[in-house]
Amino acid sequence: MNCEKESQMTIASQSIEDFKECLYQMQEARKSVTNEILETGHIKADQVQIFKSTLEEMNDERTSKNHIRDIHSRGTTFGINIQDEIKGLQKDHHFLDAFAVESDKENNSFANVLKLCDLPGLLSKFVDDEIRFEKEVAECKAFLMDLIDTSTTGGIKPLFITDWDGTMKDYCSQYATNLQPAYSAIVMGVFSRLFTRAFAVLTAGPLRHPGILDLTALPINGPVLFSGSWGREWWLGGRRIVHDDGIPEEGSVAIGQLCEQLDEILHEGEFVQFALVGSGVQRKVDRLTLGVQTVFKQVPEDLSARYIDAVRERIHRVDPNSQYLVLENCSPLEIEVCVHSSGAVWNKGDGVAALVESLHDSLKVGKVCVAGDTASDVPMLKKAADENPENVRALFVNINKQLQENITNIVGDAKRVCFISSPDVAHAAFAQIISEFSG
């Protein structure tokens, strides 16, 4: 791989195109390594070299000590925070380097290699409080052990339905490079294959362009199922299944036309950086989500305001009479352009129902675990609790006390609820269970 395509005159910054290409090529390597480990349990040391070289690239003189990388495009230079990208690479480099060494030894099983690599110990080095992390991992492990115990369900394995960002994947400042590390993909994939009858990711983002299928390191036709747009679109059996209930055809056409219009303004000098600002540009089944500011407030307010005005102007071009599209200010960080829909508002609970129907499964059977990190994930839990009140479980990340109380009340039993501080707690617990109970 060659990530060093910068000309001498732009060495102080990196182009958007080369920045994304460098990370996307590395993500393809992650997918390849993950797939090989899932299939064979082994990798070679030379397959890990790309992680070291990409990490060195991301830590060169164009990135400051506080992880701000200078990026340029069409005469505009700006900084983006790449702390998540760097941390993911650091963890992968250490983990995969150790995995390659141990898996090269004769007659070393996958479970034993994973144990020797000590993923929980590695991940604990990246937190502020190692003792708290280890305590949470032990509690999460006990919670998951109860979940996968089939002695009370007639041998039926559980369903595991989870949110993505903030739950199974740390938040990233740029959606376009919100890339899943290989260590996460490996333990998720093996845990889902061994201990669940279905492990499904239900995210608000889209499936493609970019979407969860581009950003994950897992094989998209592998042990973990993926959805986008709050479960309105699923990738099942190698094809995209869309649930467009209540969305008029004219609205879908208008969203498509607007997406083309926005692609034009994102190639104009003034607004190029918005492709990498927060949510970027996400085309979902019934809306577009647009990032207008970063969590670190790196975009000048007047530039953000001009961008929003430009979006409004393009909406007016596509839908001059405001028949099909509406602009909503979701937060200081993003706006959404939504299709006027008929009927009830779709939520993640509807996405769960769509999945179960497509799988010809039932929430009433066996145990069901719902994982999330915000109030938008609660409809998934409510749906599962309504269908299976005695066997529903909740695993939630880094949430406030009020939401914790709400979740505990929905489940109805504190023993069937687990609260953790980061996705890596779950990854570490997955690794421990795989090492100890998969032979």
Curated annotation (Swiss-Prot):
Summary of the function given for this chain in its UniProt record: Catalyzes the hydrolysis of trehalose 6-phosphate to trehalose and phosphate; prevents the accumulation of toxic levels of trehalose 6-phosphate.
Keywords: Hydrolase, Magnesium, Metal-binding
Protein name: Trehalose-phosphatase
List of residues binding Mg(2+): 163, 165, 373
Catalytic activity: alpha,alpha-trehalose 6-phosphate + H2O = alpha,alpha-trehalose + phosphate
GO molecular-function term, one example from the UniProt record: trehalose-phosphatase activity
Pfam families: T6PP_C, T6PP_N
Enzyme class: hydrolase
EC number from the UniProt entry: 3.1.3.12
Active site: 165
Family: Belongs to the gob-1 trehalose phosphatase family.
SUPFAM superfamilies named in the record: HAD-like
Tissues expressing this chain: Ubiquitously expressed. Strong expression in intestine.
Cofactor requirement: Mg(2+)
Keyword field contains Metal-binding: yes
Binding site for substrate: 282-284
GO cellular component, one term: cytoplasm
Disruption phenotype: Lethal at early larval stage. Mutant larvae show intestinal defects, and a high proportion exhibit gut obstruction (gob). No visible phenotype when gob-1 is down-regulated together with the trehalose phosphate synthases tps-1 and tps-2.
